[in-house]
């Protein structure tokens, strides 16, 4: 039994012996190298890398440009037009077939939308408006061109 007692005492502590647990000091783990992340930018055409802070031109990238032609019949359709603008699509709105009050409300709603998005709204004809997001630039004016060519 002497061997079995030794075996027991080796693996199982006797009740008489006190058990102390020593804390092992951990060595700090080496830090992993940070990966480069792009910072969010208001301008969609440039990406700034975190570590190097270099500006990378994205002018070579192709963005699909879409234009939406809309002729809303009720004010409730204005939200759908705003969603197109949020998706960076140009919207041409023909308000000739809607009441004056409804047309005014739609223009007011779209004016607020393009202001919030940093875009622009322009009148291009009788009750026809061009709404553009911030990534579209419009030069000139149709009424100025018509005056110059004596079409009016």
From Swiss-Prot:
Q: Which UniProt keywords apply?
A: Cell cycle, Cell division, Cytoplasm, Septation
Taxonomy, superkingdom? Bacteria
Q: Where in the cell is it found?
A: Cytoplasm
Write out the GO biological process terms.
division septum assembly; FtsZ-dependent cytokinesis
Q: Which GO terms describe its cellular component?
A: cytoplasm
Q: Which InterPro entries match?
A: Cell_div_SepF, Cell_div_SepF/SepF-rel, SepF-like_sf
Q: Where is this region: Disordered?
A: 23-42
Residue ranges annotated as compositionally biased, kind Basic and acidic residues, are 23-32
Question: What family is this?
Answer: Belongs to the SepF family.
Its quaternary structure? Answer: Homodimer. Interacts with FtsZ.
The entry's function note states: Cell division protein that is part of the divisome complex and is recruited early to the Z-ring. Probably stimulates Z-ring formation, perhaps through the cross-linking of FtsZ protofilaments. Its function overlaps with FtsA.
Name of this protein: Cell division protein SepF
């Amino acid at each position: 039994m002497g061997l079995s007692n030794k075996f027991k005492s080796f693996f199982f502590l006797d009740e008489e012996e006190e058990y102390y647990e020593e804390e092992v000091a951990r060595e700090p783990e080496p830090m992993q190298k940070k990966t480069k992340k792009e910072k969010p930018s208001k301008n969609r055409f440039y990406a700034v890398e975190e570590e190097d802070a270099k500006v990378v031109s994205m002018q070579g990238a192709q963005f699909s440009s879409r234009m939406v032609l809309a002729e809303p019949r009720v004010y409730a359709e204005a939200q759908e037009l705003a969603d197109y603008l949020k998706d960076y699509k140009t919207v041409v709105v023909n308000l000739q077939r809607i009441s004056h009050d409804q047309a005014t409300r739609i223009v007011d709603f779209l004016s607020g939308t393009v202001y919030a998005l940093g875009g622009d709204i322009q009148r291009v004809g009788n009750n026809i408006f061009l709404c553009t997001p911030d990534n579209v630039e419009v030069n000139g004016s149709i009424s100025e061109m018509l005056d110059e060519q004596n079409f009016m």
